Amino acid sequence: RNYERGRQAFVDAQCLACHRFGREGGGVGPDLTAVSSRFARRDLLESIVEPSKVLSQQFENTTVTLKDGESITGRLVEETPETLVLLPNPLQPDAKIRVEKKKVASKSASKISPMPTNLVDGLSREEILDLLAFIESSGRRQHPSFQQ
């Protein structure tokens, strides 16, 4: 596997926008540091290419259906007795939607992952495998995955 290509794929797929990795990254998604100690390679790959297949309650989105029939899905980032605040796109943290509770017909857990499904669409099979090796290595160039 190729370390540089894996690191670049990690950047290109915008992983750090949502995921913590070492001392960098966001906190919207699961921490990817040492994730290979908790999950098998197949599960990691599946989570990258099919993020909605297995959802963690800790990171699930909420779907709010309004009385007028409109639905809004996003991460519930704030709730008061009067309002709900949703973040529909974790890559746009300033685009929060405030909803008055009196306008809400229902609120439920979404079955769709907040991780977009198309983040690796521009990557080749080899780049995806290098990305997987980079994540498994916790970003360490000396990891056995990168030794010839």
Show where each model-derived region lies.
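Extended surface/linker regions that mediate inter-domain or inter-protein docking
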Residues: 2-9, 60, 71-72, 129-134
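Gly/Gly-Pro-rich "capping" loops immediately C-terminal to redox-active cysteine motifs
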Residues: 25-49, 60-109
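An acidic site on a long C-lobe helix of protein kinase domains
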Residues: 2, 14, 123-127
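Electrostatic cytochrome c docking/interface patches
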Residues: 1-11, 30-33, 39-43, 67-70, ...
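C-terminal capping alpha-helices of c-type cytochrome domains
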Residues: 70-72, 76-84, 97, 108, ...
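The canonical Cys-X-X-Cys-His
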Residues: 6, 12-22, 32, 131-138
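Post-cleavage N-terminal segment of exported redox proteins
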Residues: 1-2, 21-24, 134-148
